[in-house]
Amino acid sequence: MFNNGDNMSRERFSSNHSMQRQKTESRANFSRRLVPSDSNRKPVPNGASNSPLSRDAASHLISTIETSIMKLLVVTKELLESLTNWSKGTVNDSAVSSVYVTLIGEFLQTTKSFHEAGIETADLNDFPLELRSVLEQTLEKTPSSDALETNLPNVRELVMHLLQSLKYKQSLVKSRLNQSRSNLPQMTREANDNDVNRRNSRGSSQGSISSFRNPDSRKQYEETTSASLSAPGAFDALKQTNALERRASKRLSHMVKDQQNNEGSSQNLRNITVESVRGFLRDSSKPDNIMDSPSPKVSKRPSIVRQDSHDSNKLSRRPTINTSFDRKFSPKLTRTPSLTKSLDPGTPTSLKSPSLRKSPSSFVQKDVYSRSNSLRISQANRSNVFPGATDVTRSVSDHRILSSSTINDGEVAPPLPQRSRTISSPNSPLSATVLPSSTPILLPRGRSSTLSVNKKQFNADDGSTLNSPNSIRETEEYAASPKLEDIADEVETDATSQRELLERQIQKAESSEDTSEIESLQGKLSLPQVSSTQQEIQPSSSVPEAASNEIAEKEPAVTAIESITERKEEAPVISSSEKIESGTSISTSDTKGGLANFENDSLEELERLIQQNNAEQDEPSYKFHKYEYSSEESGSEDEFKSEKDTKGYVISNDDSTQVEEDSEDKSTPNTGASAKLINDPSSTITVSDVYPKKPASPVEITEPPSSALVSATSPTTNVPIVPEAVHLSTAFSTAPVSTIVSNISPLPTVAPPNVSGSPSETPISKPEKVPVVSQTEKALPKPLGVDTEKYYFLRYNNQTRKVKVESPLSNANELGELFSNVYKISFSGDSYELNIEDPDTKISYLLEDLSDLKYKSLVSFMFKEQDANKKREDFHSGEVSAIQHSSAQNTLDDHVNTTTHESPSSAFTEILERLKAIEQNISTNHTNDSAALKSSEDHSKLANNFSVPDSIDHKFYQQVKNMQLELASLKQISAAFFTRIPLKIKDFKKEINAFNEKGSLDFQFGRGFVLSSKDRIEREVKNVVEKFDEVNDQIELMRSDVLLRKVRPGLDQTSQLNEESAYLEKRIQTLERSLEEVTPIWKKQWERELNAIVQEQEFLDSHTVLISDLKRDLSALSTVLSNVSAIAELQAKSSIKSKPLTLKTATESEIKGYRDQIQLEVLNLKPDSEARLQAIERSELLQKKRLLQRVDEFSKEVKTFVENEKLNKIGGAEEADRIRTIQDEKVRKILWDDFVSSKRNGKNGGSFIEESSDTVLDEHVVPDNSAKATVAEIDYGSQVDTENFMLERSPLATPKPLKQPDFNIYETPIVRSTAHETDDEQTPSKYSDNRVESSSDTVFENTDLKYDNNVQMSKVTHHVRHDTISTDDYDAYEDAEDVEETSLT
């Protein structure tokens, strides 16, 4: 199938290519291509526009285009008719699909015709997928007229847009062809006219080359004219040549961009299937969510928006089709929902204007605008009341809300209000009223609340309207709107991240020990203190108790309302006439009714409090276990709820104020708001914090020592309060409400009411007077290093107690006595150890120096090992003896008494409790083998020591023994179970990993896995078949034995065959499962390979087109370069010099005008950073190329000389080294070899030394022949040969009178041959070797050294010795020469 398709496509491509080549060859060349002025028109490719078509080719092309368009019109009409018939039920879906296929075929033929004419059709590439998505959406529904009316307008709009585009392109083709025909004769006429003008303008000053003419030189003018005539059409061709289009560069950039975009979705592209494509197209045809979808890109053609003719200010009810599709993926039709239906009467008029089409954010602004009338916070009010709200609002608008755009006459959409999550219950007063706009309500999301807010409490200066029904309705819509929850989450995230950032900064400041920075950061982090004045616990009867209980059953949470407004004056003191009733809400607020004013608060801190409140409320209800009453002591719940609280404590701000006991109703237990809040979680608290101008510190009240409920009132304020009630305003400013409730001291135990109705006999003792800390003392900070309280923490047996002391301990004995008094333990002097915990590292260490013991230190007491074991044994033996004694006594009493007692003895109960404790200990410490072993030893010891007297009833003893056995068996079972648990977990992990590997389709299953699984399955099948053949042979043999030979088969044979058949069945099942496992993986791999094949085909096609674009770009570039080269050669031949630059002077007014113009242009500039960076890079590359091109003439010549290999081949460095080695060897032989051999043989040694010592020539007297020979050697550059004649006066020789040398004795000078000798023979000489050696002692110090390398000749020294030279002396001499050479160098 693929081969046939490839052949067909190859034949089609070859035929098209040959046709296009023939058409191209038949076109005439022309040098200018007209570009349409319309912005939508694309540049015409060179292959289609470099030369105009002939008349026959143009007419044929136009007729082909017209025929294609006509066929396309007919098919579109058939498509509309098929849709109509489909809605009537006369045709099915397949008929519509076949018409669609025909339509797409005609569409592709039409686009191909336009492409041959040089018209780009890229704007129509998305039409097939758009039409397909609309048709799929239509055919999904049941055939009906309603379904057709819903989707038929979309089909018609797509078809109309297609036909209009084709009509426009058809007219464009005709105009271009006509224009190219008319341009050809006109260009010919212009060329002829230019030639005539050149001939006629040689003598005039208005010639065509007047810019290169010097009027003062007739000769130069003639040279210029003749030079310009050598390239007559260079300038004209350069002017008529269009700019380089860079087709290949643009195509490559698009390809790279597509590749980068596809990298992110490579996994999805690799997993594409037919079903997934259909599902994607089906989903793409549905309208997206406007809130979540990004703003669409601007399409090259405007969206088709049909408006009603009678009203242009209203949006059309018909859907709008946005055709800005992404070419990389399957396009989709984005339909804008009708806004006319959703606009309510309360919507501003600006939202109904057509300007919404310009901004996609207007759809969001409609919802935001309609909900922001009554809950909007102005910028000024927000900055004064809530300093941190501006930044948070800005961050919210940046992340979630589209920027405010201009809506109808420059009106800007207002900003969103601050975070307000109001969730009101049906019984809440907020159901009928709303809060003012400057009062955001902060509640945990998803929490129910009962709000007791009075209308009179709102600030009159706020200016908010509460009576408007529209504002109430819009506020409720805004509070219930799910679209703003994400914005609230962003505020929470920003607040939490800001707080974490401050905490990290504080830690860094602490590490750097910067005190000022720490204080400033802590000031930002902490909330401002709330004053303790004017706080009250007032009753609230706005919410019924039943409703409160019903809401609390659904969500047992303590909620809070923090209201923000501005105070004008302080509230007066509250009277004590108000009492606390059960079931009411606790509220601290103004008596004037004003709400709390957070002057220095921030939204981040409020969000943090709400989050802490949520965390506290999500914890289990047993958090308040300290405040629960036992069922036996508290009596019935109804009686407890019927009690009324008339008692309380009073807080006074005066230093002399004391808390006294109220004399009324002392016997009545307290069941007030605190008890109700603790025992009845359905009760709620409403807190409104008040900030006065002079804040004061809260008042602390210690817990009264009485065990019964007492109440006291202050003689000054008489305000009822809760015991140990740290002011709720202060507590709420630093912790959630649930934390405030948990910090309230537990209420005393209430005696149960007497059944007979008599008053309780439990006495109520009077509490001591509670000292009250003054505000001034509380406000003053404690000095550093001074402990106001003196106490230690003592720990023994995992119990820690706080012990107060009057003075610091002086020695370890006092500390031991303190432990003995607290824990009632006895010990000897050295039988215990004391450990202390370091407060910084939390590490315990042995207390050796009492200077480490400070107040508030944690000290642990423990016995040493031996004493600990002994104490443990004594403890166990004491327990056993106590059990024996008590059980024996109780058993005797039971025998004496009657047998009517049904309950077991106390000893048996104690034994059962201890056994339960042991069982719990085993269950908790089952992983510790040593602990289990030790406990078993203790139990065996306890059982052995437990001797039962004969007089004791054996019934209980047998029960205990049975329980002991059961416990031992349970212990064994649990140990075995916990031993198997790690193995089971390990196996389970292996199975999970295998399952994940098999289940994950992204696992590296490639062609290798397919081949390996194929081989494995083949091997398994082969083995199964072989085993099957063996079993078949055995069964056939057994069958023949039974039928023919009448042999009785053995049962062992039949059983074995049954086992083998069962084994084969299992193997077959395994093989089947293997096939089922690999089948989906193989299919997935096939899909990937098919996708890879398609992508590779696309790669080849795209790069083939890219190569064609490169060729066309190269031809255009060559044309422009040839024209520029011709002009450059023309100018180089002419002797005209370039005109010097002349600077024009401007007046001050002109300079001012230029400056203003430049400044205006700078203001109007909209720089593109990416384009500027690209331009900078291009300029840098051009500059580098210019620098590389700057090469002088000498460098060019040397480079050419070396590249052409014009140097003579003389052997190079290797040849020079070889020659030097040969010369060195010759010199060594001449100087030393003969001399050393003669000395060893004892021939003429002394005479040679005497004679050579006498032959010391004058420094300035040189024989002529020797000098010539030396100069000849130096001219040839032979350093080594010249050394034969250079001798140096030895410092060891004794100076003697100079003698006149006899020049006649030198008949033939010793001249070394400069040729490259290979033998060691010397030139013929009249003298012997000794004479040669003596002649070598002559020193030529005045020799003119012409070459630098001959300077080393002066370094050679020959010492005249008066003693016999041996081999050791020769070696020492060489060493001396080396040292001397080094020193000279």
Swiss-Prot record:
Highest taxon above the source species: Eukaryota
Amino acid composition bias (Polar residues), ranges on this chain: 177-186, 258-274, 419-440, 447-472, 528-543, 574-591, 883-903
Phosphoserine: residues carrying this PTM: S602
Example of a GO biological process term: actin nucleation
Keyword Phosphoprotein: yes
Segments of skewed composition (Basic and acidic residues): 620-629, 638-647
Name of the featured protein: Actin-interacting protein 3 homolog
Gene source species: Schizosaccharomyces pombe (strain 972 / ATCC 24843) (Fission yeast)
Gene behind this protein: fat1
